[in-house]
């Protein structure tokens, strides 16, 4: 696979994960609305609060990589702005390596958690009795995609090809 094809594949992965996150946000809205309607009409719909939580968690984890790649994560760049190019590059490599290592641990834990929940038939304690591996799988997928994004950023920084994206949002002082 050529580099350009790999870039397109990775960008598509981050983009589709963001689309999935958006769908889960809609799922959160639907679950909350269903719970509200159920309280007024007493329809007997069970577990809407739990499903809203599952959808919200899935949305958050699936959006992590896209957020990282678009420069939307919180960063302390005051030190980086003061450094010369070589020192800045070294600090960026160190920070990205540390973040990649943490993301790898997080992904490994998330995958193991979902697998163990599936293996031991773990279910939620709510009245919905959902097998926990189902919502945990979204977390595992999101953390694995985040790990891929950090490896991508690290490799780009080492090769000197990383383009730092910054948020278009204006700085806020409160």
State what each model feature region is.
Residues 1-174:
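Alpha-helical transmembrane segments and membrane-interface helix-loop junctions
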